[in-house]
Amino acid sequence: MTDLLSIAPRDKAEILAQALPYIRKFHGKTMVIKYGGNAMTDPALQADFAEDVVLLKLVGMNPVVVHGGGPQIEQALNRLGKKGEFIQGMRVTDAETMEVVEWVLAGEVQQDIVGLIHQAGGKAVGLTGRDGGMIRAKKLKMVDNKDPSVEHDVGQVGDIVAIDPSVVKALQDDAFIPVISPIGFGEENESYNINADVVASKLATVLQAEKLVLLTNTPGVLDKEGKLLTDLTAREIDALFADGTISGGMLPKISGALDAAKAGVNAVHIIDGRVPHSMLLEILTDQAYGTMIRSH
């Protein structure tokens, strides 16, 4: 990407002028951002992401960050000599793995993100779904995609029962940027590991967000030939599920994105987190990036 310092002043002014209509349009609106993939592990992309989030806040939007941490969890499990297992894109989470998930997400990844936002000039507060009773969950009953009579036991993986967004709204009103780890709690105060894409999608719905933006390690949703699909409807997504084009970790991502679109989130985007400032390009310019999910 071109170094901003090398751009001529007139071109910089034109870029800012192009962003102005979007800044006006989205002023005061909530943007839920799922932060994951390479954008979380590359230092330059980490700094870019933090700067982008702070900029959105400074121009009057309300960014809410929900983060993943799969690679970091996998590294921690490897150090313990424990092998990670996935079923239909969900991490199998026994009691020991749940302890690792909580420690890595809330104690390591979340705090790194909060620190980066502070370095970029913003104010962030880290939360888990336990804080403020935000995310109530129950054990996920996972039915096999190909044989509905088969149910997989994925341990302490959670299915969201309800989200209370009051703590998030309070932080937004006080000029903070919420950074949320996808951990919920059950009736017996047990912890649940919840897919971050699902949390972001449900939270966007509850907050009546203007946009849900999911950062990934791909240009967006790809067909079987590797071509980018820029616009997908519910019917098209069902067909991609059926023929196996969408599989693995993309399953919960696309399902959650579609649920959010059906529930009234105005725009749902799956974009390439490996592209510097891709989030700003999606939100503040007329240049479309990645895949847009529509309910119809």
Swiss-Prot record:
Under SUPFAM superfamilies, the record lists: Carbamate kinase-like
Top enzyme class: transferase
Question: Would I find Manganese among this entry's keywords?
Answer: no
Q: Where is this site: Transition state stabilizer?
A: K34, K253
Positions annotated to bind substrate: G69, G70, R91, N193
Q: Name one Pfam family in it.
A: AA_kinase
Metabolic or biological pathway: Amino-acid biosynthesis; L-arginine biosynthesis; N(2)-acetyl-L-ornithine from L-glutamate: step 2/4
> What coarse category fits the chief subcellular location reported for this protein?
cytoplasm
The molecular function terms of the Gene Ontology recorded here are:
acetylglutamate kinase activity; ATP binding
Kindly state one GO CC term assigned in the UniProt record. cytoplasm
Give EC number(s), comma-separated.
2.7.2.8
According to its UniProt entry, one GO biological process term is: arginine biosynthetic process via ornithine
* Subcellular location(s) of the protein: Cytoplasm
Keywords, alphabetical: Amino-acid biosynthesis, Arginine biosynthesis, ATP-binding, Cytoplasm, Kinase, Nucleotide-binding, Transferase
Report which reactions are catalysed by this protein.
N-acetyl-L-glutamate + ATP = N-acetyl-L-glutamyl 5-phosphate + ADP
Q: Extract the NCBIfam families matched here.
A: argB (TIGR00761)
Its family remark reads: Belongs to the acetylglutamate kinase family. ArgB subfamily.
HAMAP family per record = ArgB (MF_00082)
Q: What does this protein do?
A: Catalyzes the ATP-dependent phosphorylation of N-acetyl-L-glutamate.
Write down what this protein is called: Acetylglutamate kinase
According to its UniProt entry, this protein's organism is Acidovorax sp. (strain JS42)
Which gene carries the instructions for this protein? Answer: argB
